[in-house]
Amino acid sequence: MKKSQLQKYAKLIARNGVNVQKGQDVRVRACPDQLDFVRMVVEECYKAGAGKVTVEWEYNPVTKATYKYCKLDALSRTEKWEEEKYKHFVETRPARIFIESDDPDALKGVNQEKVAKAQQARAMAFKPYRDQLDNHYQWCIAAVPGVEWAKKVFPGDTKNKAVEKLWQAILFTSRADGENPVEAWNEHNKDIKERCDYLNSLKIKELKYKSSNGTDFRVGLIDGCNFLGGKEDTLEGIEYNPNIPSEEVFTSPMRGNADGKVVATRPLSYRGELIENFSVTFKDGKVVDVSAEKNEDLLRSMISMDEGAAYLGECALVPYDSPIRNSGITFYNTLFDENACCHLALGRGFNECLEGYANLSFDECKEKGINDSLIHVDFMIGSEDKQSFDCHLCPFSP
């Protein structure tokens, strides 16, 4: 892959992704799969005016060894320095960049119950800080190819060829393969905004999904809860793009108002393992049954993370004609696969979808119907059979 094109991708992440402000600190989290690209991102952040850029490294084999050998009480414990780090985030509000390259099977063979308990304890400990940061800083998730991930996507190719093909797929689907990715995203954001404005003008009350694969589902929406997509704004008015790529327009549904069965159309990578060929059944908004051909126990563990994990936090609509769907690739990565087709998310909803949310407390957002949870996990339900997958738009009464 040409370095000049990767430099443009890095610039896209710094400029359109987190939109680094003059003097603002930046935190980058990455795996050591593409070291030179991480350097490019750091460089572009400084060119954009960043104060100080700090990189936090993650290495999947170390993470796996930690979960395998570390005692649960130690895994669950939060250290003083970690709390101080979050306090510092709340005070300074750095932009945050997450560069994904994880192996979809990174934690295969690890005790998932142990992982769940540790993650739940730590998530609860840090939730107050995350709530304080919510919508007060820019963040962006983007991706680079790791060898294990590339081989999962292109199993018939050599390691080098698989990585090269995944690079090409990432840049193509991220609209970063052209001469000016920054301008391409400016135009893309305009298109997404037009779609959001149209959907919001309909005052949609309910979405209905039906497919020949077994999906037969309805979900109620919240009056005054908008569809968003593409670029977002912090409460301070700073624009940023949280996901690169992104094709979706999304909203948060009414907690407790969903019934029926949805059948997933793509695998879900969760906690370093793949959940495959699964379905989820709702009654009165809550998950009452799940089934999966692979890792059903992991799926059940996910919806048991806390009370809100069994309720929906997002309904997203994705156009059938999009770069990711047109690529024909299953990425085994939610950042990409969720933008290939319509999807739902279990767990935490989006307060920012509510009209006037800046003047609402967290409790007031919950009272209006926004779900709260420690998790937010997207899963794909869009069918390629357009004749058998429909979305019925039922407007609120005037």
Question: Could you say what each language-model-derived stretch is?
Answer:
Residues 289-358:
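Dual-mode signal for accessory low-complexity, basic/Gly-rich regions
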